[in-house]
């Protein structure tokens, strides 16, 4: 009747079809879950320096340094379909040149086996908070937002924003010392 290769091909095709159906069922079982969490964020020790921006032609730029406290519980997000979270803190503000400026100042990968309740105190920025001009000084509406990507085992990569945002006014004078 059928030779060995034909039977192996049929078995492999059926197995792949069943695995695809199970993967789709896994995705559909978690697609409608709510992945938003609330956080408690405090930003303090904000200092702004006017530095030379070597990436542009002899222009000055504002460099902000700050520390923040973050408390958030991600434990309810980890179901069987969540592999890990990519968590990052974004500073958003408007300037004369750009309607929206978004700067990622800190990030962390949170895996299932790690601590999923974050209680960070006095964390410094991981990346430079550099504005391409002098728009940070005296800015009264810099919004800090915690966002995270939910990385699943099966399904699409979900971008989620935390429910709480923090609006912070920036200092009115530059810091002149070299120490942060």
Swiss-Prot record:
Signal peptide: none
Transmembrane found in the keyword field: yes
A cellular-component GO term for this protein: signal peptidase complex
Glycan attachment points: 141
Transmembrane segments: 13-33
Gene Ontology terms describing biological process: protein targeting to ER; signal peptide processing
Name of a matching Pfam family: SPC22
Compartments, record wording: Endoplasmic reticulum membrane
Coiled coil: none
UniProt key word Acyltransferase: no
InterPro entries in alphabetical order: SPC3 (IPR007653)
Keyword set, alphabetical order: Endoplasmic reticulum, Glycoprotein, Membrane, Signal-anchor, Transmembrane, Transmembrane helix
Topology within the bilayer: Single-pass type II membrane protein
Regions of this protein lying in the Cytoplasmic compartment: 1-12
Lumenal topological intervals: 34-180
The protein's role, per its UniProt record: Essential component of the signal peptidase complex (SPC) which catalyzes the cleavage of N-terminal signal sequences from nascent proteins as they are translocated into the lumen of the endoplasmic reticulum. Essential for the SPC catalytic activity, possibly by stabilizing and positioning the active center of the complex close to the lumenal surface.
Family: Belongs to the SPCS3 family.
Assembly description: Component of the signal peptidase complex (SPC) composed of a catalytic subunit sec-11 and three accessory subunits spcs-1, spcs-2 and spcs-3. The complex induces a local thinning of the ER membrane which is used to measure the length of the signal peptide (SP) h-region of protein substrates. This ensures the selectivity of the complex towards h-regions shorter than 18-20 amino acids.
Full protein name: Signal peptidase complex subunit 3
Naturally occurring in which organism (per UniProt): Caenorhabditis briggsae
């Amino acid at each position: 009747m059928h030779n060995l290769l034909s039977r192996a091909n049929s078995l492999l095709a059926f197995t792949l079809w069943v695995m695809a159906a199970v993967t789709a069922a896994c995705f559909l079982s978690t697609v409608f879950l709510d992945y938003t969490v609330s956080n408690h964020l405090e930003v303090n020790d904000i200092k702004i320096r006017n530095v030379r921006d070597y990436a542009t032609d002899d222009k000055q730029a504002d460099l902000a340094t700050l520390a923040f406290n973050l408390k958030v519980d991600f434990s309810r997000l980890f179901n069987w379909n969540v592999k890990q979270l990519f968590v990052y803190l974004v500073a958003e503000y408007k300037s004369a040149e750009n309607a929206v400026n978004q700067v990622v100042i800190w990030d962390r990968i949170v895996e299932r086996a790690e601590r999923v309740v974050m209680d960070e105190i006095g964390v410094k920025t991981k990346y430079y908070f550099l504005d391409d001009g002098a728009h940070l000084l005296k800015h009264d509406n810099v919004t800090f937002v915690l966002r995270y990507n939910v990385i699943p085992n099966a399904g699409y990569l979900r971008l989620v924003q935390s429910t709480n945002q923090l609006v912070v006014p920036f200092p009115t004078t530059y810091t002149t010392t070299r120490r942060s």
